[in-house]
Design a protein with these regions (language model features):
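Hydrophobic alpha-helical transmembrane segments
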Residues: 114-124, 145-193, 363-367, 381-405
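Helix-loop junctions and terminal segments of transmembrane helices
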Residues: 58-74, 86, 252-279, 283, ...
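Membrane-water interface segments that mark the loop-to-transmembrane alpha-helix transition
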Residues: 8-21, 46, 51, 55-105, ...
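Signature of the first transmembrane helix
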Residues: 5-62, 213-240, 369-373, 388, ...
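Helix-terminus/linker motif at the lipid-water interface of multi-pass membrane proteins
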Residues: 23-39, 161-164, 223-254, 272-273, ...
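Interfacial segments at transmembrane-helix termini and the short loops linking adjacent helices
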Residues: 37-38, 104-120, 307-336, 382
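Membrane-interface junctions at transmembrane-helix termini in multi-pass inner-membrane proteins
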Residues: 77, 124-147, 334-360
Length: 438
């Protein structure tokens, strides 16, 4: 893919994602003012549960499927991948549904309104069945964005129509579920039109699960904890603290999610370049992605520190002023998260370093969990936000160590020079060998 075409595609993807944030800018203050702190806390807790179920249903299938589709040579091969992944996700959806019901009854916040938890579980299953990975693997980058914008518009109309007061939290989940089902109908209809009907089967599910386990372990160590932070806080603190943390986390999630559009273009491109033997081109594309992500991480770090005390109370109201302090703690996470996104997505996934990702992901998840269990009961929302920062920082340290050991440091802008300076300062001989790559 030439540079000009890449810029156009990335620009279109970011323009589509702009609709996501316009949507959130509308609904987040609407939720805060219409539902209040307690009602909004229930919505945030249910959305956290939805994200956990989403991760369980997805189970690392998306990056594996995207990687396989990027290398596919025919429609028949794509249909075979499509059929296998749909079969596996249906099975995982049944398991995720059972887990969601149990989690609903165990949460003091959600058990008071169990229907919200049920709707959140169904929404997580529907979200986990999405086909964005298929479109990205086939380099149809614009298609999932158009479908997603359609879903946002539909849910926005439903939310603004149905949510009228503090007791209408259930209609938020119902609106999101209807929009998710409608978007899935469109995406599956388009894929079936292009590739044919999926052939559901049990054969091949176990090998797919085995191949996806390493990436799932990475996501379960970091991403699942990230998605479940609000739910964990419902077990350790009060609904008010859940509301303060959830509001700040939502803004942090918005900032972090802006890394996603570029990844949707860079990761399939790097994967295809490596599959075609264009190692030099893959390295160049990787460095471009690194520069973009790291610059963005520093930008949102400065913005969150400086603007949080003014922006959050203005958008959510004075009652959410404690959320601004939580977001300022989250700000220290952004540079680490940008580096982690680059190494995991742009370096390791295209080069099939799944096992290494699993090891560091599990270690980071344990650090996250231990820090949260220690800090959340004492400091509430600020404690669990600090635990997230600690987890991301430790993940960055581990990923950097692996990159150096694999001699892939040349893919990090300025990494080779910085490592050489550290070695000279420590009295070691400078490394002169060129970077190796699979």
């Amino acid at each position: 893919m030439d540079r000009r075409k890449s810029v156009r595609i990335i620009g279109f993807v970011y323009a589509g994602y702009l609709m996501r944030y316009v949507y959130l800018i509308i609904v987040v203050p609407f939720y805060g003012r219409m539902l209040g702190v307690a009602g909004y806390g229930r919505v945030l807790a249910s959305m956290s549960l939805m994200n956990v179920i989403w991760m369980l249903v997805n189970y690392g299938f998306s990056p594996v499927g995207m990687r396989d589709v990027s290398k596919a040579q025919s429609v028949e091969e794509c249909n075979d991948i499509f059929s296998l992944h749909v079969s596996a996700r249906i099975f995982h959806g049944l398991v995720g549904g059972c887990i969601g019901l149990i989690a609903t009854m165990c949460s003091p916040v959600l058990s008071q309104h169990p229907l919200i938890g049920v709707l959140a579980t169904l929404l997580g299953i529907v979200s986990g069945m999405n086909l964005g990975w298929m479109f990205q693997g086939r380099h149809q980058f614009r298609t999932p964005i158009v479908i997603e914008v359609f879903g946002f518009l539909l849910s926005l109309v439903l939310v603004l129509t149905l949510v009228k007061g503090p007791n209408d939290a259930i209609w938020v989940l119902a609106s999101l579920l209807v929009a998710g089902v409608a978007s899935s109908v469109v995406s599956y209809g388009l894929t079936i039109y292009q590739l044919g009907w999926p052939r559901l089967r049990l054969a091949g599910i176990v090998p797919l699960v085995r191949n996806s386990t390493m990436l799932f372990l990475y996501s379960s160590g970091s991403v699942v904890f990230t998605a479940s932070s609000t739910y964990l806080l419902t077990l350790l603190s009060t609904p008010e603290q859940v509301g303060y943390f959830g509001a700040a986390e939502r803004f942090a999630t918005i900032a972090l999610a802006l890394m996603g559009p570029a990844a949707q273009v860079f990761i399939p491109t790097i994967t295809r370049q490596l599959a075609q033997g264009d190692v030099q081109g893959a390295h160049q594309t990787t460095r471009h992605g690194a520069a973009l992500l790291m610059a963005y991480g520093l930008l949102i770090f400065c913005g969150a520190l400086a603007l949080s005390p003014f922006v959050l109370p203005l958008i959510l109201g004075a009652s959410f002023e404690p959320s601004s302090h939580v977001l300022q703690i989250f700000a220290w996470m952004f540079p680490f998260a940008a580096f982690n996104e680059f190494v995991a997505g742009y370096v390791f996934v295209p080069r099939k370093k799944d096992r290494l990702l699993a090891v560091v992901g599990i270690a980071s998840g344990l650090i996250n969990l231990i820090a949260a269990l220690i800090l959340a009961p004492r400091y509430g929302a600020t404690g669990i936000a600090l635990a997230r920062v600690i987890g991301e920082a430790m993940l960055s340290v581990m990923l950097m160590g692996v990159v150096i050991r694999l001699e892939l440091i040349s893919l990090v802008p300025g990494g080779t020079r910085a490592l050489g300076m550290v070695r000279v300062a420590c009295g070691f001989r400078p490394e002169t060998r060129s970077a190796e790559d699979e």
